[in-house]
Amino acid sequence: MKRFLLNNGSEYSYEQLLASLNESDKYYLLYKQLDLYLFFVNLIKALANNAPLVLLDADLNETEIDGVNVAEINVPTKIVSTTFVNMEAVVEAVKTPTSEITIFTSGTTGQPKKVVHCVQTLMRAVRFGEKYINQVWAYAYNPTHMAGLQVFFQAFMNLNFLVNVFNKSRTEVYALIETNRVTHMSATPTFYRLLLPFEKVYQTVQRVTLGGEKSDKKLYESIGMIFPNAKINNVYASTEAGTLFAAKGDSFQIPAAIRDKFLIQEEELLIHKSLLGQSDSFKFDGDYYHSGDLIEWVNEANGLFRFRSRKNELINVGGYKVNPGETEKVILEIEGVQQALVYGKANSILGNVLCAEVQLVEGSTLTELEIRNYLKEQLQDFKIPRRIKFVDSFSLTRTGKIKRS
């Protein structure tokens, strides 16, 4: 039997999935479900039968989002359900629905916002074909958000095996990769940093993808040592637009075919509305959406650029605009640092005082003084945190990113 999903010790085949899809003429428009298999069954059933979906986090509370009738959550809806003869027929049905999927932003810096997509937008970057059919994917994202959906579609549309590693410990992740001979994985930089330190290498992994946050050279080097046979790439995707760019080193390239769909205004990336889902929260300048991402050109003629920061993350320190990502990047260069978060704390004189929380690699004896001495060599004084606090862990959003508010 061809394997579909391994989740918390339970394994499911595509044969079982087909039976689950055919056994009922009901599905859930609004579904809160912790069980990943049941979540995927409902997702596939809706799409294969051209029914709309609103994807909700299992731990969602009604104060977090607007526009959802709580009384309708987990209430079954009857549909005209197709009986499928095999999984290939299901895949074909999922390719062409006209129904809409409503998802919510991760809430990294504020209240989650609703965005409505068609399936074609969500599957814009999915690749099909013989070369993809034997891949084994480590599933390292929340399934209700953009990145999780895109990894799911890439695996499912090629009938690949998915191994759930989301919210697992470092030792559990490595055991699952080794036991199931994982070949592909996609996750946030925060997820990969949580895999450090490492004790051995994993030869079966062929491709590692990062997305959702800024990364750094030190992390790329660590990933290259853990997975020596893997190609490493970075992608730019958003809840609003889906996948748009792939990276070349630390730079992203706007494809020539859609270069006219982007503008740069005051260093901010603007995206044409034709590439977006639908949302009442979008802020447009004519036909272009303000992404909130600040960039710098590497080669404007070739469409190559680097991300600098999120516009709403810049911190006013005594009249200077500080990019916390720049300071974090330097802190992460220091041997013994696993993760770092830089933020502003309100101050009546300076506007904000720059602060940092630092998580050390297990066994590290790094001191605050050593961190400060290194930062003094690399950064201007106003970019150096006045307060540095050592922490054991960081709060994460539902999508696995560090929470910044």
Regions found by a protein language model. Name each.
Residues 3, 82-104, 131-137:
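Conserved pre-ATP/AMP-binding loop-to-beta segment of ANL
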Residues 292-383:
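AMP-binding/adenylate-forming catalytic core of the ANL superfamily
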Residues 123-136, 144-184:
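Conserved AMP-binding/adenylation subdomain of ANL enzymes
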Residues 264-304, 320-322:
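Conserved ATP/PPi-binding loop(s) of AMP-dependent carboxylate-activating enzymes
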Residues 99-127:
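Conserved AMP-binding A3 loop
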Residues 380-401:
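AMP-binding/adenylate-forming catalytic domain of the ANL superfamily
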Residues 20-60, 139-142:
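Conserved AMP-binding/adenylate-forming
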Residues 196-252:
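Gly/Ser/Thr-rich phosphate-binding loop
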